[in-house]
Amino acid sequence: VIFFKQGLMPAVDANGKIILEQKGKIAMTPDGHGGCLRGMCRSGAAEELKKRGIDCISYFQVDNPLVNIIDPYFLGFHIKSGSEMSSKMIPKAYALEKVGHFCELGGKMCVVEYSDLPKEYQERLDKNGQLEFRAGSVAIHILDRGFVERLGGSGEGAKLPFHRADKKIPCVDADGNQI
């Protein structure tokens, strides 16, 4: 097990304006999945994995206490398929379930967050009467270390876009009054 500190970034409101945690202090939030990859590289964690001969990284959300941290079947599938990144999915329980949606976009598999996929798409049924977008992301992944180094490093491959995540963050106005 290797621990490292993920980076932070200023929190912004719906209009992109920086918000304050308290008068004179900018509210900060974790810098997301891309930031986690950058943190692995900047902290030396990726290099430490390389020294230990570890090529696959089990990656999941901290708030999922039920995750099977090392799933031998999932790991074997990942290695056998030759993928750089593998993700688990579950069938959605209902149309508007708040999970990401596995979708093919521009010929590539990706996850579109529920907050970004219009309701009419989330509710769309296929010819068999099943949800067209029924593959839900549980944010459990296996990542190749080289993939992390390429995306999280400082080289040309490190151009990960920021994705806006709407969260309720305690904040104050310029005078220090709680909003």
Regions found by a protein language model. Give the residues of each.
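Conserved N-terminal catalytic core of the sugar/cofactor nucleotidyltransferase
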Residues: 1-54
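Short, active-site-adjacent cap segments at secondary-structure transitions
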Residues: 10-11, 65-67
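Catalytic core of tubulin tyrosine ligase-like
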Residues: 49-58, 66-70, 74-179
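Short acidic donor-binding/metal-coordinating loop in glycosyltransferase active sites
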Residues: 62
